Amino acid sequence: MRSKSDKKKSLVPRLRFPEFREAGAWEFIPLEAIAPLVNDRVQLKDISNVNYVSTENILQDFGGVAVANKLPTVNSVSSFQAGDVLLANIRPYLKKVWAANFSGGASNDVLVFRPRNSQGCQYVAHILKNNRFIDYVMAGAKGVKMPRGDINSIKEYPVPIPPETTEQQKVAHCLSSLDEVIGLQAKKVQSLKQHKKGLMQQLFPAEGETTPHLRFPEFREAGAWDKQRIG
């Protein structure tokens, strides 16, 4: 049987910022204790497509949110505010987790977590936007075709917390900086895809035409293209 000291040692991360290497062991705290679920309501008349969030417009793979296509036909919806972390609780494996940067309303199948400490918002967001958390939710999910996470189980999710708030903030800042780089790279990739799509349209003859609109200099006098079978 492991001693308490052995368990404490196991709660020290392998990689740690130099100034925190002697700060002591981390501990696990239930999610409910640091970011409880909130059940506040807001009138639908105060919500628009821009600030309404449902399981449909939270994007997969921690991709953020899109503008909602429609609003529900109800009087009120769940309320969230900037700094909350939202989880689409239908088919959790789709990884629809979003850290809110504005206030609004959410559908009933979206869980709203509110960090008790406003300085811990980023940290909680990174904990929930993590495959380990998603695997945990799926392990306790109920249903086959449309599995839902078990709310009581989710509340008990063990969140690793360092002994000093400053370490928690530095970890969150580091991960957020990486997210920004990833986001910029994703935009570059999307831009390149659009550029390639445009080139494809220019480098091949359009329907009903025999020469492309854009041609390499050495082939501009090579004549018209024709159709042949490949292989």
PLM regions: where:
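Extended intrinsically disordered, low-complexity coil regions enriched in Ser, Thr, Gly, Ala
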Residues: 182-197, 204-210
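Short, solvent-exposed loop/turn positions at domain surfaces
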Residues: 20, 73-74, 165, 177
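Short, recurring structural edge motifs at helix starts
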Residues: 2-4, 15-20, 142-146, 155-163, ...
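DNA target-recognition domains and sequence-specific DNA-contacting regions of bacterial/archaeal
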Residues: 2, 32-161, 231
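Non-catalytic DNA-recognition/assembly elements of restriction-modification systems
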Residues: 12-42, 215-231
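Hydrophobic structural patches
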Residues: 17-19, 171-182, 204, 216-218
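Intrinsic disorder/low-complexity detector
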Residues: 2, 7-10, 208-209, 226-231
